[in-house]
Amino acid sequence: MELNAYIDHTLLRPSASEAEVLRLCQEAQHYRFASVCVNPCHVALAAGAVRGTAVRVCSVIGFPFGTHVTEVKCAEAQRALDDGAQELDMVVRIDKVCAGEREVVEREIAQVAARCHARGAIVKVIVETALLDEMHIAFACSCVEAGHADFIKTSTGYASRGGTEGDIQCFKKYLKGETKIKASGGIRTRAQAQRFIELGCARIGTSNGVAIMEERAS
């Protein structure tokens, strides 16, 4: 698979305009990226812009801190799906991961995943690895699998750092099933993206997709 097919072309700035979202969608179609990842308020716009193409629409749930209660995350997910989202990146309750509260974490993931799967959509669970040690990452991997999420994702882009090679290796150490991995946060070059793919990532989240593709052209 070519590099472009791994990229979730991302625009999650709170100041992002509708014109910028439409440009994001045009770029995604031109470079044949896997998806556009936009804020919930822009899902319907993006869905209309990429309708009839292979580009999927991704949005975020409980973003960026994961501190929404489960009922709110479920409502967000339902609205995004109704607006045309095909993929949802949900921030887990990081405080509950750190506290080891398995039932709470698994139940929340399972509830959002069930809504997604009922509509033929996929869910990626953001665990914010910058805030976790290896023990917490192992716990998060177990919860993501138990909740039947499709992906585990490293980062929101709002913590002190994005995903690292060590994070990916840690995911691979503790994931036991078919859960896929998405790397994100600070991926700005072609070499970085390719390295994460070599490590086993199935998706790359980046707002620098065009620059990464143009790097090849130059």
From Swiss-Prot:
E.C. number: 4.1.2.4
Keyword Cytoplasm: yes
Lineage: superkingdom: Bacteria
Catalytic activity, as annotated: 2-deoxy-D-ribose 5-phosphate = D-glyceraldehyde 3-phosphate + acetaldehyde
Subcellular location: Cytoplasm
Enzyme type, top EC level: lyase
Function description: Catalyzes a reversible aldol reaction between acetaldehyde and D-glyceraldehyde 3-phosphate to generate 2-deoxy-D-ribose 5-phosphate.
HAMAP family on file: DeoC_type1 (MF_00114)
Protein name according to UniProt: Deoxyribose-phosphate aldolase
Organism: Treponema pallidum (strain Nichols)
